[in-house]
Swiss-Prot record:
Accumulates in the posterior primitive streak of mid-gastrulation embryos at 7.0 dpc. In the adult, highly abundant and enriched in the brain compared to other organs. GO terms for cellular component: plasma membrane. It comes from Mus musculus (Mouse). It comes from the Eukaryota. Pfam families: SMIM43 (PF21976). This is Small integral membrane protein 43. It is a single-pass membrane protein. Keywords: Cell membrane, Membrane, Transmembrane, Transmembrane helix. The keyword Cytoplasm does not apply. InterPro entries: SMIM43 (IPR054149). Its main location: membrane.
Amino acid sequence: MEWKLNLLLYLALFFFLLFLLFLLLFVVIKQLKNSVANTAGTLQPGRLSLHREPWGFNNEQAV
């Protein structure tokens, strides 16, 4: 009887960890899609880019 309880516990733990893994994978894929969509949106040629250099210089000031 006790081995059935252990088996049930291990199966429940296994499926719970599998669920957490798929949830994490889903969140990571969603973030990657969002990141790729954001970078593709800023690289469109018809749209003005609001990209700033990290040190605060504009292209006109650097010349």
